[in-house]
Amino acid sequence: ITQVGLNFSRPAAQILGQYYQFIRLGFQGYKEVQQNSMAVADYLHAEIGKMAPFQNYSKDVVNPLFIWYLKPDYAKSAKWTLYDLQDKLKQSGWMVPAYTLPENLENWVVMRIVVRQGFSRDMADQLLGDISNAITDLEKLEYPTPTRIAQDRQQAVKGSVFTHTGCPKSTK
């Protein structure tokens, strides 16, 4: 063979990148990367679970991701929702989505964290600090937020839509 070429679409590029990482790091190196992601996810899960407003959805973390929600008793008296927390965190540069669960659980609003490769313990501490600061700011509110009012009226509430351009997505 005198020439080798790869023809792949964009999704295949990510798979090829994954293969490269596996070959470069080897099994042990790749395992360490995943163990680090799990350790950071476990840490975040535990620390967020200790925060007064929140309840983790699951007891254990089995993948480097988890979700949490407002404790029902806290949510009854709060003047804000997780959508408001999402917006506050976005102001600090964090993309932590808030959304409703699928059918039959659509009344549950949750937030999700996915710990990716390279997300360090220092970054986790910074995120926790920003969550804590956002909660402090939200708890100082004198009046309920528009999302809280809509939620109380049982109106549909959706979080803001993220785009890399900063412009709303076109509906053309």
Where is each model-derived feature located?
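Short glycine/serine- and small hydrophobic-enriched flexible loop segments
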Residues: 20-24
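Catalytic-loop motifs flanking and including active-site residues across diverse enzymes
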Residues: 10-17, 62
